[in-house]
Design a protein with these regions (language model features):
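Conserved AMP-binding/adenylate-forming
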Residues: 29, 46-90
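Generic structural signal for well-ordered alpha-helical scaffold segments
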Residues: 8-11, 41-49
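Helix N-cap/beta->alpha junction signal
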Residues: 40, 63-65, 110-111
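Structural core segment of the AMP-binding/adenylate-forming
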Residues: 78-124
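Structural motif detector for alpha-helix initiation sites
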Residues: 3, 32-33, 92
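AMP-dependent adenylate-forming
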Residues: 7-31
């Protein structure tokens, strides 16, 4: 079994079992394996169809700690892509250097970082 199979198998074996709780959300986000796998499948499908992410492409994520990182990690696993987590505590200039080094095909970011992403976009 590889990482891309994990959530799909968990959905088969225990679809209604609580898989994850994101206590950082208001209200608290609780997902079963079935819900979580389908959520990750939607992201993987979007990455593939819209962002044209494929095998060995890098997908960068700029977000605070939360389920979004795990969604991205498992979606990348389903596609054979490389999950590239960016440290949200870095200054946008440091993130530019990381992006130039890793060359991600797409950057996923949370609304908290829209100003930084605008600066990053201008700099690249």
């Amino acid at each position: 079994m590889y990482i891309g199979d994990y959530l799909g198998r968990r959905e088969i074996y225990s679809p209604d079992t609580l898989a994850i709780i994101d206590a950082g959300k208001a209200p608290e986000l609780r997902l079963t394996f079935k819900q979580w796998n389908r959520r990750v499948n939607r992201l993987a499908n979007w990455l593939s169809a819209t962002a044209k992410v494929g095998f060995r492409d890098r997908v960068a994520i700029l977000a605070r700690d939360g389920i979004e990182h795990l969604d991205s990690f498992y979606a990348c696993g389903k596609l054979g892509a490389i999950h590239t987590a960016l440290n949200w505590r870095l200054h946008w200039r440091e993130i530019v250097a990381l992006i130039e080094d890793t060359q991600p095909k797409v950057l996923i970011y949370s609304d908290d970082f829209i100003d930084s992403v605008r600066e990053i976009e201008k700099a690249i």
